[in-house]
Design a protein with these regions (language model features):
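Conserved ABC ATPase "signature" region
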Residues: 125-146, 194-197
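Conserved ABC ATPase signature
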Residues: 150-154, 158
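The feature captures the beta-strand-to-loop junction immediately N-terminal to the Walker
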Residues: 46-48
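Conserved catalytic motifs of ABC-family nucleotide-binding domains
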Residues: 171
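Catalytic Walker B motif of ABC-type/P-loop ATPase nucleotide-binding domains
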Residues: 175-179
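ABC ATPase NBD coupling module
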Residues: 77-98, 123-131, 201, 241-245
Length: 257
């Protein structure tokens, strides 16, 4: 699959975690978590505080080493790979905290990532190719009008869009979003949901963990609910919302989408 900015996603692309386990001392926080993300699929990883969802997410990202189980990306075992090697294989991670260069403007933030990329033959991108991809990304993420704006002047929603543009500059197969709806206003939430839909249309698999349940379920194709270190339930948002056990331990009886 190709796009105007050069993203290439394999037809059989998938990210899969199987039987993940993690303990800290005598406390086991992740007992048995398995999940998968296919190309062009938006998956939510949700659950109560302390359930093990964040630790599971960080194991998939590569920030936390698993004690058991495995992680595969497009059939390749990445369980013990550090985050930078997973990134080279096509896994992009957007942390909750600001990840843009605060002293650069918007276009230089994206250009800095593009200058590290190579073409299909492994050669550095030409200046013309960099500038074309830069223009395409700024347009697609609707930040073209901000290209000369300093990063420090961006709102929370604008910053998120620039961060996603930077992530797309690496031509990822999967993007893992940590709390993408945190600290932004309702209008920006709608814009982030639109962008996630845009990633899906590009064939990129998206894994989201967030405390904002409605916003996350509102964009997901599939969700996994983690409780007490295990997968309590999985399925479509409708299935999750109507699951009696999920309502009892997580959503509450009066939850509505």
């Amino acid at each position: 699959m190709s796009t105007s900015t050069g993203s290439r996603v394999a037809d059989d692309s998938h990210l899969r975690a199987q039987h993940l386990q993690k303990s800290y001392g005598s406390r086991t926080v992740v007992k048995d978590v398995s999940l998968s993300v296919q190309k062009g699929e938006v998956v939510g990883l949700l659950g109560p505080n302390g359930a093990g969802k964040t630790t599971s997410f960080y194991m998939i990202v590569g920030l936390v080493r698993s004690d058991g189980g495995g992680i595969q990306m497009d059939g390749q075992d990445v369980t013990h790979m550090p985050i930078h090697r997973r990134s080279r294989l096509g896994l992009s991670y957007l942390p909750q905290e600001a990840s843009i260069f605060r002293r650069l403007n918007v276009e230089d933030n994206v250009r800095a990532v593009l200058e590290l990329q190579t073409d299909e033959s492994g050669r550095p991108l030409t200046r013309d190719a960099i500038e074309q991809r830069l223009t395409d990304l700024l347009h697609e993420l609707r930040v073209e009008h901000l290209r000369a704006s300093p990063a420090l002047a961006l709102s929370g929603g604008e910053r998120r869009r620039v961060e996603i543009a930077r992530a797309l500059a690496t031509q990822p197969r999967f993007i893992l979003l940590d709390e993408p709806f945190a600290g932004i206003d309702p209008i920006a939430v709608i814009e982030i949901q639109r962008i996630i839909g845009f990633l899906k249309k590009r064939g990129i698999g998206v894994l989201i963990t967030d405390h904002n349940v409605r916003e996350t379920l509102g964009i997901c194709d599939h969700a996994f609910i983690i409780n007490e270190g295990r997968v309590l339930a999985q399925g479509t948002p409708s299935h999750i919302v109507n699951n009696a056990e999920v309502r009892r331990v997580y959503l509450g009886e009066h939850f509505k989408m």
